[in-house]
């Protein structure tokens, strides 16, 4: 799947991961690309025409959100950013869940066989730049603000673009799975994720790691109904 969504002056490209409903996002500006949670997806390549360098951001360390890092680096120069904790776990096949990824498909033989045969597992990659608590920078006229946000995973973080577009990874899903992963931490979620997103306007657009784009106003009541139950 590949689709584009126009968000005012921003054209957002959305791609899925072949075997699981995980999202890779891309924005273009001035011959550059901002790519969030890359996977190995041939549909991305034509959209990278004219791009000389990519700013790559990882919302957390789980395999389905990092699986395209090495592939992307083989295609063009990249600067890969993530939290320090995320970076420390990218090289551990247990902590990045690539060792156990095939087990997600034990009930679907076709997908299980595909994963075991076609995907490069187990998998590791390396980040080029990290931040401890927060990152503030300008990317081709767009403001980027990232902050550490554990809960779903120890290395989780949130990325806010221009104060209105929030890439939440698996921290903001609305399907009850935010705290169902190995290493999930309810206390961290309630102290690092929820207080921050409550400071943002309800019309903030949320681009989740799985599922469809929504707004904080629509998503937060759903999440809080089961997180704080």
Name the predicted role of every residue range.
Residues 33, 136, 143-228:
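Metallo-beta-lactamase
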Residues 15-17, 126-128, 148-150:
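Short Gly/Pro-enriched turn/cap motifs at secondary-structure boundaries
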Residues 5-12, 114-119, 139-143:
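Short Pro/Gly-enriched beta-strand edge/turn motifs at strand-loop
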Residues 2-49, 158-169:
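Conserved beta-strand hairpin/beta-sheet module of binuclear metal-dependent hydrolase folds
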Residues 10, 51-54, 78, 142, ...:
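A structural micro-motif
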Residues 33-36, 55-58, 148:
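Short catalytic-loop micro-motif centered on adjacent basic/acidic residues
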Residues 41, 45-136, 221-225:
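Active-site HxH/HxHxD metal-binding segment of metal-dependent hydrolases
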Residues 40-41, 63, 86, 151, ...:
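Short, glycine/acidic-enriched loop or turn micro-motifs at the edges of active sites
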């Amino acid at each position: 799947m590949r689709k584009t969504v126009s968000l005012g002056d921003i054209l957002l490209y959305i791609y899925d991961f072949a075997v699981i409903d995980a999202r890779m996002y891309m924005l273009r500006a001035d011959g550059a690309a901002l790519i969030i949670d890359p996977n190995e997806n041939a549909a991305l390549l034509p959209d990278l025409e004219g791009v000389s360098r990519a700013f790559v951001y990882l919302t957390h360390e789980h395999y389905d959100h990092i699986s395209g890092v090495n592939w992307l680096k083989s295609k063009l120069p990249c600067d890969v950013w993530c939290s320090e904790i995320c970076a420390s776990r990218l090289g551990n096949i247990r902590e990045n869940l690539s060792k156990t990824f095939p087990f997600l498909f034990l009930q679907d033989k076709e997908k299980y066989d595909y994963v075991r045969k076609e995907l490069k597992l187990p998998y590791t990659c390396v980040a080029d730049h990290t931040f401890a608590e927060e990152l503030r920078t300008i990317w081709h006229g767009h403001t980027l603000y990232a902050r550490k946000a554990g809960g779903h995973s120890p290395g989780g973080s949130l990325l806010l673009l221009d104060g209105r577009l929030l890439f939440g990874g698996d921290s903001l899903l609305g399907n009850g799975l935010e705290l169902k992963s190995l290493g999930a931490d309810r206390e961290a979620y309630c102290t690092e994720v929820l207080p921050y997103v409550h400071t943002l306007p309800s019309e903030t657009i949320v681009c989740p790691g799985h599922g469809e784009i929504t707004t904080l106003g629509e998503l937060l009541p759903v999440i809080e109904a089961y997180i704080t139950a």
